[in-house]
């Protein structure tokens, strides 16, 4: 039985934490374009908590959005060659030999990450699981 004026749980709009940028990113290693996911930051998504002794910010969970992990959006990962870097490093690579080495190691990176994170996907919205996989990819890339 439905009550008029009361929305069912499935009818409610899903709360957005991120969006896909209109501008495509160009991978400096394989020269292919891919989508970039950017975290939305307003409306109480990130409630800054205390700093730890290591000066790391703890983010408090909000009632509306729950626990947020903003650090998973700092890494960019190309879904074509599995190159992952900080977004600030995801520009033109000056050393062409390094870019060729990164490209030749792409399958090795994918297999290494797949053994630890077997269900990671670089095409969907990021979860904590996918964010950890991207950090591991970045570790293997650098």
What is each PLM-predicted segment?
Residues 1-103:
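N-terminal cysteine/histidine-rich coordination modules
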Residues 91-92, 96, 100-142:
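Extended interfacial segments that mediate partner engagement and assembly in macromolecular machines
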């Amino acid at each position: 039985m439905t009550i008029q004026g009361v929305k069912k749980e499935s009818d409610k709009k899903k709360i957005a934490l991120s969006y896909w940028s209109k501008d495509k990113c160009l991978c400096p290693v394989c020269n292919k374009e891919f989508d970039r996911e950017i975290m939305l930051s307003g409306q109480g998504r990130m409630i800054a908590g205390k700093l730890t002794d290591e000066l790391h910010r703890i983010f408090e969970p909000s009632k509306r959005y729950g626990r947020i992990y903003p650090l998973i959006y700092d890494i960019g990962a190309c879904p074509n060659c599995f190159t992952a870097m900080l977004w600030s490093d995801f520009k033109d690579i000056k050393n062409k030999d390094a870019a060729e080495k990164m490209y030749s190691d792409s399958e090795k990176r994918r297999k290494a990450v797949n053994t630890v994170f077997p269900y990671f996907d670089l095409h969907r919205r990021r979860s904590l699981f996918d964010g950890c996989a991207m950090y591991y990819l970045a570790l293997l890339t650098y």
